């Protein structure tokens, strides 16, 4: 007698396979993980929604404007352990007329309206001896009396560690910021001394900066100090040249 209920799969059965019912196992797992990550990301964003009511300050260095760098000096300084040395003395050689004149002629050759949006003091620190393992320290003060004479060396008290690239950058802009100047080059050429006092220090801080290390030995530091001007330039009201192109 023939058995109609045979469990042998080869008897009386035909299978037709359609590729649309088959998917790559890797893509299935990736899609599932992608959906899971999206759900988790949406949950995290929802937890941060209450923070939308708060405001944070962005780094002004990354804002719009053209950067013009004035290198004040580059020299080697010796720093003893547990002390910090003054690296900025605004009444000294950092303000030589030759340095400023070359900077103004190279950086602002175009005669148009400009605005000094911010000035950054930038200190680049490098060890002079190889295979030294220490970190750079820095401390600065923006506000001080005009007749204040800073100490050349101070003790280390709550300093800041210099960040990535051993660069220490400080914004010198006062509250409100900005220094609109009509034709910066002519302002400088009229009177060098009045330009520094009236334009720069009336609108920006004359700060004090101290540099040190956390080393237990005396270290030699290659210090490069520069001022970085963030300048906004305005287009002239009328074309500089008249012709078919205009």
Swiss-Prot record:
Matching InterPro entries: Polyhedrin (IPR001746)
Keywords associated with the record: Viral occlusion body
One Gene Ontology molecular-function label: structural molecule activity
UniProt-recorded name of the protein: Polyhedrin
Gene Ontology CC annotations of this record: viral occlusion body
Superkingdom of origin organism: Viruses
Role played: Major component of the virus occlusion bodies, which are large proteinaceous structures (polyhedra), that protect the virus from the outside environment for extended periods until they are ingested by insect larvae.
Keyword GTP-binding (UniProt): no
Family: Belongs to the polyhedrin family.
Record bears the keyword Membrane: no
């Amino acid at each position: 007698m023939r058995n109609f209920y045979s469990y042998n799969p080869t008897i009386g059965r035909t299978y037709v396979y359609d590729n649309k019912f088959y998917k790559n196992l890797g893509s299935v797992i990736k899609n599932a993980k992608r959906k899971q990550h999206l759900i988790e990301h949406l949950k995290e964003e929802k937890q941060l929604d209450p923070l939308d009511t708060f405001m944070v300050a962005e780094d002004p260095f990354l804002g719009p404007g053209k950067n013009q760098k004035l290198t004040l000096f580059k020299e080697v300084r010796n720093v003893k352990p547990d002390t910090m040395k003054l690296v900025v003395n605004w009444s000294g050689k950092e303000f030589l007329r030759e340095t400023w004149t070359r900077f103004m002629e190279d950086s602002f050759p175009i005669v148009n309206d400009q605005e000094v949006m911010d000035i950054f003091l930038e200190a680049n620190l490098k060890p002079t001896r190889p295979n030294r393992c220490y970190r750079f320290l820095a401390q600065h003060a923006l506000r001080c009396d005009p007749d204040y004479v800073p100490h050349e060396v101070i003790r280390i008290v709550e300093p800041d560690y210099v960040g990535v690239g051993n660069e220490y950058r400080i914004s010198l802009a006062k509250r409100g910021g900005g220094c609109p100047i009509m034709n910066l080059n002519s302002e400088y050429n009229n009177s060098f001394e009045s330009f520094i006092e009236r334009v720069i220090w009336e609108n920006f801080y004359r700060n004090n900066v101290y540099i040190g290390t956390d080393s237990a030995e005396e270290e030699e530091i290659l210090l490069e100090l520069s001022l970085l001007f963030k300048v906004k330039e305005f287009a002239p009201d009328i074309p500089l040249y008249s012709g078919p192109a205009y």
